């Protein structure tokens, strides 16, 4: 047996290598051909052959993609298909797995679409940096679409269910045909210039590439890019892409999804609103409590500085001054009484009659007449001086100036304060030229 240095492979290893080689060597490819041997088993996948006059290739389109086909695949139909080359390893079958397929008449439109998309992308119209964010709370929405299509019904139904408070303006337009793109562009520019709307939605239902061609118009794409109002594009089904989708600020796969993106679900808002209300109530109560405390402090300050408080303070001061004055007058009267008593004692001790008797006795004892005369004059001068001193402290002199000394007739005690007497009590008032009996009348003390 000959010795072999080459690697020996099993069929599965060889098929795996061939699959890796195919998938790594070929990018996404477009093929235009005729359908043949079309089958759709219960799994929902689509199997068929693409052929021309000289060759054919097996193809598969799995259910998630085949569901969105806009036509019914049939024998002999010419199509334009997009997919990747691969190898089904179990049988070693070389095949094309498709993710998109359309009728072949759309091929020229597809090439024009790809060329325009590449040019606009190179200009930066699709860049994420230039796209605007949607406002958190949309209040006014402009919807540009056909007034009779399924898209507008889906959008309005979702909006009414999720957030019926939204203000929606329907701007009716053609959505396919030669004049559709110009009409959509005009409505978009007018809505944007009005400044009335928070968001502008451009939408329509599904269709073929030719049906959706108005949304691949270059003028419309540039108008969307220039709009100051955020623009949402929801054209066709999830697998459909238009230039308006690429250039819009937000692309929604379907009209219904676009409506869901634009407004919150009112059922989800209820607990949020309740939490906000509870928080607002808490803040209001806190603010009210602070305001009431501040009002109480201000009220205390106002009461402390009010005229009534000032009068009360003055009244208390007046009462205190009255008490002090009464006490002072009592002290003065007591001192005057003491001085009167001392003066009376001094008067008694310096009685002129007694002093004169002594002098006369001394004069009789003196024999020389001249000496007696001088002594007598000296004593008279001294007597006058003493009399003046006594007169200065004599309470009767104070009475002579208009004052009175009030005493009780029963015991002769001096009345020093109005608080010591009672209404109706009889008293004696000593005046300069005599005394009078008085009676206490009720009144202010």
UniProtKB/Swiss-Prot annotation:
Family matches, as InterPro entries: Exonuc_VII_L (IPR003753), Exonuc_VII_lsu_C (IPR020579), OB-fold_nuc-bd_dom (IPR025824)
A matching Pfam family: Exonuc_VII_L
GO molecular function list: exodeoxyribonuclease VII activity; nucleic acid binding
Annotated disulfide bonds: none
Entry EC number(s): 3.1.11.6
Known catalytic reactions: Exonucleolytic cleavage in either 5'- to 3'- or 3'- to 5'-direction to yield nucleoside 5'-phosphates
GO cellular component: cytoplasm; exodeoxyribonuclease VII complex
Location in the cell: Cytoplasm
Any one Gene Ontology BP term: DNA catabolic process
Main localization, broad class: cytoplasm
Enzyme class: hydrolase
Keywords: Cytoplasm, Exonuclease, Hydrolase, Nuclease
Family, similarity comment: Belongs to the XseA family.
Its job: Bidirectionally degrades single-stranded DNA into large acid-insoluble oligonucleotides, which are then degraded further into small acid-soluble oligonucleotides.
Oligomeric and partner information: Heterooligomer composed of large and small subunits.
Record protein name field: Exodeoxyribonuclease 7 large subunit
Gene this chain is encoded by: xseA
